[in-house]
Amino acid sequence: MLATLSTERGRLDRLTHTEHLPAREARYAPWPQGIRSEVIAAAGELGVTLPWAHQAEVMDLAKTGQSVVIATGTASGKSLGYLAPLLSDLLDGTEARNGRGATALYLAPTKALAADQRRRAAELVPARVRVALYDGDTPPEEREWVRQYASYVLTNPDMLHRGILPGHPRWSTFLKALKYVVVDECHSYRGVFGSHVAQVLRRLRRLCARYGSSPTFLLASATTAEPAVTARRLTGLPAVAVTDDASPRGPLVFALWEPPLTENVGEHGAPVRRTATAEAGYLLTDLVGNGTRTVVFVRSRRAAELVALQAQDQLGSPLAGRVAAYRGGYLAEERRALEGALQSGKLLGLASTSALELGVDVSGLDAVLMAGYPGTRASLWQQAGRAGREAQGALAVLIARDDPLDTYLVHHPEALFANPVEATVLDPDNPHVLAPHLCAAAAELPLTDTDLELFGPSAAPLLPVLEQRGLLRRRPDGSWYWTRRERAADRVDLRGSGGSPVQIVEASTGRLLGTVDAAAAHTTVHTGAVHIHQGRTYLVRDLDLETSVALVEAADPPYTTSARDITSISVLSTDTTVEWGEARLSFGSVEVVNQVVGYLRKRIATGEILGESKLDLPPRTLRTRAVWWTVTEDQLLDAEIPLDQLPGAAHAAEHASIGLLPLFATCDRWDIGGVSVPLHPDTGLPTVFVYDGHSGGAGFAERGFRRAVEWLTATRDAISSCECERGCPSCVQSPKCGNGNDPLDKAAAVRILDILLAGAPGGPSDGDPANSAPGAPGAPGAPGAPGAPGAPGAPENADEPRTAGFPAPPGD
């Protein structure tokens, strides 16, 4: 398959590396004690006569009441590992008066995955174990039945947070009998979302304890580093990690692929490569044409539709009918039909978002194409693992996007194949996350001193501040209770970035097209912005921040828009500093102030700037965590960087470092932002900041501090190895730059990183606690946190995160 792809149409130079992963034999173990004969018989009907060794280990641990996290590869049977003991215990209670004894709760990050789990559970147990979905689509008349009679309830963290926990009196019999909590795809709970879910699970444990139960947690994860540490951060409980994968695997050929340069040029004349999605469309066409069953993973719903459409157009009839798109937003029946068609061979090609990545059972694939690095090595292997199930050989191809991270990876294969999978980053102690969950917990049941131990050391200092705000009140017995009439849980959006979403409304019809986070509105739906919805193009006629409405009208402009902004950053406090010779690396708390002041109109085909318009939008303020580094004037002289080159050098280094941080922290470049300043008032030196794009921080900047030597070395290598002359999207240009990628000095960026790294042989790393950054018990933005010690700096250049209080212009 790979030879066909690379030799056709002169593509051989696009193949940058090929990795051959050998096959692996299966290792089996006997069924553990306590697994019911009905479950064993049902497994036998599915072709499982004996469990693999890692499945049996999970079963043993679960039956002894130990919380466990199973972190093995795709198609390694994680579900059977936790379902066998869980369903066995549920079967033991079916003689109870209401038809259930013990109960179990299953949490999935997506509704599609929960529906797939219901099917798997139904295959393993008789009908007397009542398995039920409980989500936003469950009709009211069914919800009461689920609460009273279901043994195994399948839901998601959002429904647990908004429905089950606030309504716990109606769930009392279920919670009293709760024996197991399954947290599936737990590696997806990262950053601020993961921190929210960690607090939801602590609230669940607290209510269970009040009702007299202490459930065992069973977590399933893709292969990640430190799964036991992640499980403990997520649940607050120690967990045993099962990581020795005993499932069989066929040989896998893993190829790294770089699309060709095009005749077009981008900003400032930079060379531009063909997009990863367009290249994926060509490769999918060839694979389907050769009868190869293939899935293409893309980063957006629109890209899934475009790749499928491109392949259909190129294939023509009758093969065009054997290619489809698969994404969130389809009806469950449509998704199941597509999965079945792919498994049966009726479909040969499927272009999918990550909706197909998370646990949905699709087997028998010959090839997987990934149109862009999915953000983490865990997701990369999760997607690649969809190929070659049932011990078949398979092909996986990573197609690089035109950005620093993807370009670095396809030219540095050791970063993917020689390094361990990264650990999941989350920070349950973030006060911006913890405080609203303390309010929600107090609304469920008054908080006691014993409860505070469950929520960690950062909880107690927050209570007086919440009392001062009029949210909580302390009783004479020392407990804390919720004072408002509104539901406390409604003040927390587990997946959002805060603020009421802005509604996008078609002006001529009043039809609601969609919503966008308040944090993203200034840069994505400002007046004059080009907005794309389901393949149609609109212009934003007006953004009303008071009513949270953006009015749009259908249009077909020959340009895209990109917001221009001004950003300042000030240091609130420095947690720790490491000397790198004359240079310094620091980690601490910062305040970032951003204001969108205008937008550029760029020609679609070339990126040529057609004009600029001014905007008058209010500034937005974010208190968060950051890593920053400084160099001295003497170092700049040694590196032959004159003052007129310094802004471009620092700006280019900042862009590239943001692009490379996702390789070392489980984040996307849109989760973080950066600022470069030739002379910062708080440091008195040239300074480059990289900060978390969420209030209070998300743990990404801290991971950058801990792995700064590796991170900044990779940044330097990514810039220096790029073949362009002055900078391009593959090295130092950023799609979210608020300054139009100006100024940038590629050569000087390499020199400034060289002088920074010259003094850093003993820099911080994850394995060196003495140099690692501490946690964030007093993270910025916490109620009562001190103000900025000085006025915000006036940086020359800034690169903003999409998920912050002030996101970036949209990019690929």
Give the role of each language-model region.
Residues 734:
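Cys/His-rich metal-chelating microdomains
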Residues 393-396, 402-416, 427, 437-449, ...:
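Extended Lys/Arg-rich polyanion-binding regions
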Residues 762, 767, 772-802, 808:
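Small-residue-biased low-complexity repeat regions
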Residues 293, 578-590, 602, 758-768, ...:
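Long, charge-rich boundary regions
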Residues 722-731:
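Short cysteine clusters
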Residues 3-46, 50-53, 57, 63-69, ...:
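Helicase motor core with emphasis on the C-terminal RecA-like subdomain
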Residues 57-58, 68, 531, 538:
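Generic structural signal for buried aliphatic residues
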Residues 737-738:
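Short, non-ligating residues that shape and space the ligands of small metal-coordination modules
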